[in-house]
């Protein structure tokens, strides 16, 4: 399993545009074979910083998303107008385990 960690600081007046684009891309993202899930978070220690954590079955699936035309268009817009900074890390999962005290509790 592959994790893609996207940390970004949007220009304050463009933050909503990032979330709008992410919402528009979600249906395309879900069509990529090997995509598992995505969640977005906001930092409590760095003002304005957001994190997108996506999970993928294979590195090939990540590559297919990277070259998807709508994603490329969104990247260009992000670089030109939305983000003042971003960083992407792609990592293999070394271990994956959890504890469930209740059926609806996941770690």
Language-model features: where?
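Short S/T/G/P-rich N-terminal loop/turn motif that feeds into the first structured element of a domain
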Residues: 1-50, 57-67, 83-107
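Arginine/glycine-rich "motif VI" loop of SF2 helicases in the C-terminal RecA-like domain
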Residues: 78-82
């Amino acid at each position: 399993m592959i994790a893609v960690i996207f940390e970004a600081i949007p220009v304050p007046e463009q933050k909503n545009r990032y979330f709008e684009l992410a919402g528009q891309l979600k249906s395309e993202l879900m069509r990529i074979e090997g995509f598992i899930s995505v969640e977005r978070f906001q930092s409590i220690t760095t003002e304005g910083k957001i994190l997108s954590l996506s999970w993928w079955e294979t590195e090939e699936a990540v590559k297919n998303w990277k070259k998807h035309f709508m994603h490329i268009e969104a990247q260009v817009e992000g670089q030109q107008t939305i983000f003042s900074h971003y960083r992407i890390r792609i990592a293999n999962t070394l271990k994956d385990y959890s504890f469930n005290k209740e059926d609806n509790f996941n770690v």
